[in-house]
Amino acid sequence: MSASSSSDSWLRRQSKRAARSLARRMRDFGQVEPAGFDLADVPSADIALYFPDGPPKLYQLTQWLPVFEGNNDVTTIVIVRQVDAFNALLGTTPLRVILVPQYEDLMALLDRANFGAVVYVNNGWTNFQALSFQRAVHIHVNHGESDKICMVSNQAKAYDKVFVAGQAAIDRHEAALAWFDQSHLVRVGRPQLDLEVNPALPLTERTTITYAPTWEGEDEANNYSSVDVYGVQIIQAMVDHPRSRIVYKPHPRVADSDDPAIRSQHRAIVAAGNEAASHDPAAGHCVLEDADMLAV
């Protein structure tokens, strides 16, 4: 047997092995039964708020929950696809939360519930399962805006409408995307700014300086984080500023980052902040990993 034939044979075996592994994963993905509803008694609602991922990304959904909770003109149901996210959400919102892991059940639910709109907070891969449903308007609202390259994903073309904060987002899409219909973009502002938010910190006469770094992204092209490069130096410079209160508010995905350098420097930043707080208790230095950024 030639080296080429041997190589081809090995590649075929590896391909089959990978295919079997993927098939098992896809099968296991649907092993959990639906929860929170019965297909024989499908809930009625105007809007389905769709969340495809697990607990580490729940911040993408929870920032939108108060917006829909406060709207008495329409009924909203939250659809989640993963059981750990479903369990984490139970008891945290007055909105009805239902678990639909399997594609067949999702299609049956969408068909019978007759939602007017399905709203997406990210570009999770199972979004495209829900997008196959024809009789609803599919709206992408994202989970914040910035000048990151991921804010102008080509996936925006998949949705009927993409809600954005303002003109900067429209300009961003126009500059980055080819053959994109700008009429799909709808300016809605930032609805969360209209909500009442309880302050996370007491008032102080000191100057409050907040360090709120982002995470490293899914790939290097989306890595805008300063945590592993300048984080400790930034905190130390803030501490050295006279009459200041230092607040460290990292992106929700910094603490459990897959990057060891990010995790290590995050811990070092927390340690530096705690040390500064112990040296000057009256300053009110603090680490706020779970607080709403609008409350800081």
In which residue ranges do the predicted regions lie?
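Nucleotide-activated donor-dependent transferases that construct or modify glycoconjugates
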Residues: 21, 25-54
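Active-site and donor-binding regions of nucleotide-sugar-utilizing enzymes
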Residues: 50-58, 62-193
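A short, charged/proline- and glycine-enriched loop
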Residues: 39-47, 134-135, 203-208
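Conserved catalytic-core segment of nucleotide-activated headgroup transferases in glycan assembly
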Residues: 56-72, 193-268
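A nucleotide-sugar donor-handling region in carbohydrate enzymes
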Residues: 6-33, 155-229, 252
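Nucleotide-activated donor-binding/catalytic signature segment of Leloir-type glycosyltransferases, i.e.
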Residues: 260-289
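A donor-sugar binding/catalytic signature common to diverse glycosyltransferases
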Residues: 120, 139-140, 282-296
